[in-house]
A protein has these predicted regions:
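Structured-RNA-binding interfaces characteristic of tRNA pseudouridine synthases
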Residues: 2-274
Length: 274
C-alpha cells in the first residue's frame, strides 16, 4: 500500500473499508468520541490514522454507552484505491499491534464509495445477559448483570410481544436525548433464552430493531425485570409504551450486561478484503 506522506493532505476517496470490531466496554466512556474521555472510537481512530498516516472519517453502526460491550460493531472509513491494496492480513496484524488489548478488529471488508456503517444498516441486534441467582458469577462477571433474586422468565417473555413492530419508544429513552428528535423505532425480535458461559448459566434477552434510542435496550430490560420480580404484570409493558413518558418505565439496567451482537446489511454490499 502506498500511504500518503502528508498527514494534512486531502486524498481522493474512491471506496470504503468496513471493519468488524469487538470490544470490552468496561474501561471506556462509550463508543462515541468525547473531549477528554477515553472512548472506543478514539482508540480506533488513533490506530487507523497511524497506519494510513492521514485523518479519517469514521462512522459506526451504533453508538454504545459507557460500559457496554460489542461482539460485532461495524465501522466504515472512506479510503483511496491505493489504500485498498493493504491486505486483510496486514490490517489485522497492524490493528492488533496498535489497539489496546480490549479492542479488536476481527474482519475487514471493502465496500462501494459512500457506504455507511450507520445508514446502510438494515437492523441491529443486542443481547442483555443476567445471572439471576444467589451465587456470584465469576468468569462471566464483566459481561452480565448479577441479579441476586430469581426472575419469572415466563412472565417477562409474556411482555415481549408488546415491544414488536414500529411504535414510539420514548418511554425507554434518556430524556435529554429525546428532545426534538424522532423516537419511533421498529423492533423485529425480542426474546428470552439461556446460555452457558464458562460453566455458568446465564439468562439472555435478545432484541433486534432497525435502530435504538439512547439507553433504550437497558431501560426495556429494567422494565422487564420489574415484571420478572412480580412487581408488575406483563400487561404493564403496553401501558409503559403508550405513556411515551420515561417516568412510566422501570429503571435502567446496568451497562455491564449489554452487548452489541451484530448488524444486518445487504450481503452483496460487503466483500472480505483479500
Amino acid at each position: 500500500m502506498t500511504a500518503p506522506s502528508d498527514f494534512n493532505s486531502t486524498p481522493e476517496l474512491d471506496a470504503t473499508l468496513v471493519f468488524r470490531v469487538a470490544y470490552d466496554g468496561s474501561s471506556y466512556s462509550g463508543f462515541a468520541e468525547q473531549p477528554g474521555q477515553t472512548t472506543v472510537a478514539g482508540e480506533l481512530r488513533r490506530a487507523i490514522e497511524t497506519l494510513l498516516r492521514r485523518p479519517i472519517d469514521l462512522t459506526c453502526a451504533g453508538r454504545t454507552d459507557a460500559g457496554v460491550h460489542a461482539v460485532a460493531q461495524y465501522i466504515s472509513v472512506p479510503v483511496t484505491d491505493a489504500e485498498l491494496a493493504c491486505t486483510r492480513r496486514r490490517w489485522l496484524r497492524a490493528m492488533d499491534a496498535l489497539l489496546p488489548k480490549d479492542i479488536a478488529i476481527n474482519e475487514v471488508y471493502r465496500a462501494r464509495k459512500g457506504f455507511s456503517a450507520r445508514f446502510d444498516a438494515r437492523s441491529r441486534t443486542y443481547t442483555y445477559r443476567i445471572a439471576d441467582r444467589d451465587a456470584r458469577p465469576v468468569l462471566s462477571r464483566g459481561a452480565v448483570w448479577w441479579h441476586r433474586y430469581p426472575l419469572d422468565v415466563d412472565a417477562m417473555a409474556a411482555a415481549c410481544p408488546a415491544l414488536l413492530g414500529e411504535q414510539d419508544f420514548k418511554s425507554f429513552c434518556k430524556v435529554a436525548s429525546a428532545v426534538g428528535k424522532p423516537t419511533h423505532r421498529c423492533v423485529m425480535r425480542a426474546e428470552f433464552g439461556h446460555e452457558v458461559a464458562f460453566g455458568e448459566d446465564i439468562l439472555t434477552f435478545t432484541i433486534e430493531g432497525n435502530a435504538f434510542l439512547h439507553s433504550m435496550v437497558r431501560t426495556i430490560v429494567g422494565t422487564l425485570v420489574e415484571i420478572g420480580m412480580h412487581r408488575r404484570d406483563p400487561e404493564w409493558m403496553r401501558e409503559v409504551i403508550d405513556a411515551c413518558d420515561r417516568t412510566a418505565a422501570g429503571p435502567t439496567a446496568p451497562a455491564c450486561g449489554l452487548t452489541f451482537m451484530g448488524v444486518n446489511y445487504d450481503p452483496t454490499e460487503l466483500v472480505v478484503l483479500d
